[in-house]
Structure formats: structure tokens, C-alpha cells
């Protein structure tokens, strides 16, 4: 069973790491709810078409989806929307994340905090997966992707980057 920070998927080969659960994740009980979840659905459709060896399904329940920080953060609850980098890189937190993604063949890190956590795990040898790094999939972050003028185009650019990174490590 999942939680606001983690959607486990026994047998999955690929996973996504985001920053932390927020109020929508807390109320719905699973990671990447609301706008981020809608963009993740768009990404999964595109990645499944482009690289089915790593993305065998467009369905989100076929992937591990987790966060670099497992605690819910949003201003009305915690007076902030993200953890500190020191919290994300803390030993206990990295051990938790390694347990969640350590057996995957491919990991896509979404957002700066996720990048830092996944790089730290790779540097320590805690994960041996192929790694890709992209912007967070919040609508605000997607709107900042250069090279396209609308959400579908920006999602395409994002997916191109992920595919290129994963294939480069072959």
C-alpha cells in the first residue's frame, strides 16, 4: 500500500523521485497528485512510446514513485513547501530512499532536491541504476522548459532529455 510520499510497485524496474509530498498528496494519500500527477501521466505516455524497454506501460501504477523527503510539506502545515537540502541529504533519509529505489534499473529524478538525493546515493554506491535528471513536473516548472511554446511541447522536450540520458549510459 502506498502513502503520500511513496507508491511502491513490486517488480518495477523503473522509478521516479520527486521532492516531497504536499497538501494534495496528503489529502489523496499518494504521491504526485493534482497538477504534478497530470504531467506525470503525460510524461508516461510519451516515455512509453519512445523507450518501452524502460517504460513498459503508460500506467503510473507500474512504476515506483517516491520523494526525496518523506514528510508532507506545505505552508499551512509546516510554513514551507520543501525541505532543506541538509534534511534531504541526512543519513537516515538517504537510507530510506535507497531502500525504496535501490533495486531499480532506471531512476528519473525530478527537481533539484531529488537530483541531490539520487546523486548522493549513486556516489555512495547505494544505487546502480541508470539515472536521468529533469525538472520537477509541477506546472510551474514545466512552463519554464525552453524549446517549446505549450505544455505538450515542453513535456516532449523533457522526455527527449530523459531518453537521451538513459540511452547515453548504455
Where are these predicted regions, by residue range?
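Basic, amphipathic N-terminal segments that precede the first structured/catalytic domain
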Residues: 1, 163-170
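A polyanion-binding, active-site-adjacent surface
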Residues: 1-120, 129-132, 139
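Short, flexible loop segments at boundaries between secondary-structure elements
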Residues: 49-51, 126-163
Amino acid at each position: 500500500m502506498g502513502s503520500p510520499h511513496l507508491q511502491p510497485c513490486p517488480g518495477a524496474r523503473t522509478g521516479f523521485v520527486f521532492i516531497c509530498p504536499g497538501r494534495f498528496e496528503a489529502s489523496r494519500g499518494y504521491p504526485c497528485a493534482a497538477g504534478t500527477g497530470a504531467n506525470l501521466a503525460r510524461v508516461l505516455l510519451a516515455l512509453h512510446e519512445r523507450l518501452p524497454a524502460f517504460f513498459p506501460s503508460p500506467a503510473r501504477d507500474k512504476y515506483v514513485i517516491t520523494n526525496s523527503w518523506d514528510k508532507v510539506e506545505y505552508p499551512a502545515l509546516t510554513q514551507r513547501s520543501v525541505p532543506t537540502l541538509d534534511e534531504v541529504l541526512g543519513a537516515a533519509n538517504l537510507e530510506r530512499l535507497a531502500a525504496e529505489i535501490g533495486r531499480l534499473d532506471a531512476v528519473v529524478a525530478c527537481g533539484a532536491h531529488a537530483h541531490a538525493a539520487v546523486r548522493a546515493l549513486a556516489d555512495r554506491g547505494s544505487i546502480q541504476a541508470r539515472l536521468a535528471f529533469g525538472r520537477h513536473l509541477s506546472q510551474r516548472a514545466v512552463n519554464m522548459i525552453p524549446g517549446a511554446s505549450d505544455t505538450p511541447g515542453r513535456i516532449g522536450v523533457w522526455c527527449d532529455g530523459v531518453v537521451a540520458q538513459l540511452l547515453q549510459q548504455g
